[in-house]
Amino acid sequence: MTREGFVPWPKEAADRYREAGYWRGRPLGSYLHEWAETYGDTVAVVDGDTRLTYRQLVDRADGLACRLLDSGLNPGDAMLVQLPNGWEFVTLTLACLRAGIAPVMAMPAHRGHELRYLAAHAEVTSIAVPDRLGDFDHQALGREVAEDTPSVGLLLVAGGTVGTDATDLRALAEPADDPVTARARLDRIAPDSGDIAVFLLSGGTTGLPKLITRTHDDYEYNARRSAEVCGLDSDSVYLVALPAGHNFPLACPGILGTLMNGGRVVLARTPEPGKVLPLMAAEGVTATAAVPAVVQRWIDAVASGRHPAPPALRLLQVGGARLAPEVARRAEPVLGGTLQQVFGMAEGLLNYTRPDDPDDIKIETQGRPMCPDDEILVVDASDNPVPPGEMGALLTRGPYTPRGYYRAAEHNARAFTPDGWYRTGDVVRLHPSGNLVVEGRDKDLINRGGEKISAEEVENLIYRLPGVARVAAVAKADPDLGERVCAVVVVEPGTQLSLESVRAALTAMQVARYKLPEDLLVVDELPLTKVGKIDKKRLRDVVRGKADSVEAV
């Protein structure tokens, strides 16, 4: 079922990807019963005291899929999913794939500002949230978003306290009452392999996130090929420590790549060393994915003697931001296993260093494309290719890089060339080994511990505050997170503005906490370039030593 606003691959490219065997012409959900039949009573998912075998997981996914349809949802619908790492997330994702419902992968850190936009833009018919996480009432927010979104008819809540106006997700996720009938029903309504399997979120520079449409064809290949490159098999035990709705832990190879190969998925609610390192030891974790800030904490915890190194670790993937060489050099000696740098994006292209690469390649580069038909160009400002070794903007296209964002024609005209090349916004150079080295971004993004924040979005929010005349949001270096948000503001005469008041105002707007400024600099005027634009390069130099600061949250 094709949605209006979805940009398909051109027929010539699609035919080529099918002929090459990248696209197998099967929806992702059609593989589940093969997994159950092959791996049966092998443990598939571990979430605290909950352990589900492959057979149990698939029975629950089928049961949930049928009950979602019985609740009024239809194949082709979209569901806003904001669940923490847990068995409910895995089961619901698989159920959606079986029923032809496309999950919109929101983050647990998102608040009403983001959720209302995502729900409206994707025209979701259902929302799935936890009851509470920490001190935040997600159920209450989910109820508000549902009431504000006319298309929503079902609010699902995972947790021990479910309101009378919501539906208990855990109860719906019981095994199918009649497994044979449920399987036959879902097989009959299976989506087309070219349909949207999942909506991922961009780290866009132009305000709120863009929706990335990943089809069953391309996302199945994304996970399958990633698992091949990373060497996952039925003995693999993969730890999900990053938010599971991110592309990285979901399908690079992540949850899907592990389940395809009969491995075990272990879910952690937090990447904090005190929780994760003992869990890795107890479950015999062999592979995991992390961002540089998390890896640094793990290294410090092991090197200081607070925790032993994970004894079974074979593969440590690091991505989401560039890994400093000095940290990369310590990863293998301290944590064990093989370091794999990952440079990828929810929009498609995945670059991996290979496990058998020499140490200098694993430390100094961010990998090479995983597919022979991944096309890359490194170009100058006029889109002319630059010589190998010189820096330029990265363009790409391939069998798992979509040709456009969802319902974003105007943005697509800027983000994609007429012949389908995606402008990634990354500045790279080609290493003599053929790998890519990431030098930075040509887009206005702030990378806070792997979460990409649009400077423009933060600026537009601060502009709503009384007395703000001009504002620029820039990245400030952070020793743990890599970068954090610094707001540089010009105020109208007589206006008093503090960091605390800005954060309080944005919190009241229901903005995700990780987007809140952590530094504020009030200035008389903003520096401008020769063409009258705010000179952010100069501002980044200024904020290095002149901002009032709060502790990173």
UniProtKB/Swiss-Prot annotation:
Amino-acid positions noted as binding substrate in the UniProt annotation, renumbered to this chain: 246-247, 533
Keywords: Aromatic hydrocarbons catabolism, ATP-binding, Ligase, Nucleotide-binding
Catalytic activity as recorded in UniProt: salicylate + ATP + CoA = 2-hydroxybenzoyl-CoA + AMP + diphosphate
Any Pfam family the entry gives: AMP-binding_C
Catalytic class of the enzyme: ligase
Documented EC number(s): 6.2.1.65
Keyword set includes Nucleotide-binding: yes
Disruption phenotype: Cells lacking this gene are unable to degrade salicylate.
Induction: By salicylate.
SUPFAM superfamilies xref list: Acetyl-CoA synthetase-like
Disulfide bonds: none
Residue positions binding ATP: 203, 320, 342, 426, 441, 533
Entry GO MF terms: acyltransferase activity, transferring groups other than amino-acyl groups; ATP binding; medium-chain fatty acid-CoA ligase activity; nucleotidyltransferase activity
Keyword hit for Ligase: yes
Signal sequence region: none
One GO biological process term: catabolic process
Family: Belongs to the ATP-dependent AMP-binding enzyme family.
Functional description taken from the UniProt entry: Involved in the degradation of salicylate via a pathway involving coenzyme A derivative. Catalyzes the conversion of salicylate to salicyloyl-CoA via the formation of a salicylate-adenylate intermediate. The substrate specificity is strong, since benzoate, 3-hydroxybenzoate, 4-hydroxybenzoate, gentisate, 2-aminobenzoate, aminobenzoate, salicylamide, salicylaldoxime and 2-hydroxyphenyl acetate cannot substitute for salicylate.
Protein's name in the database: Salicylyl-CoA synthase / salicylate adenylyltransferase
Gene that this sequence comes from: sdgA
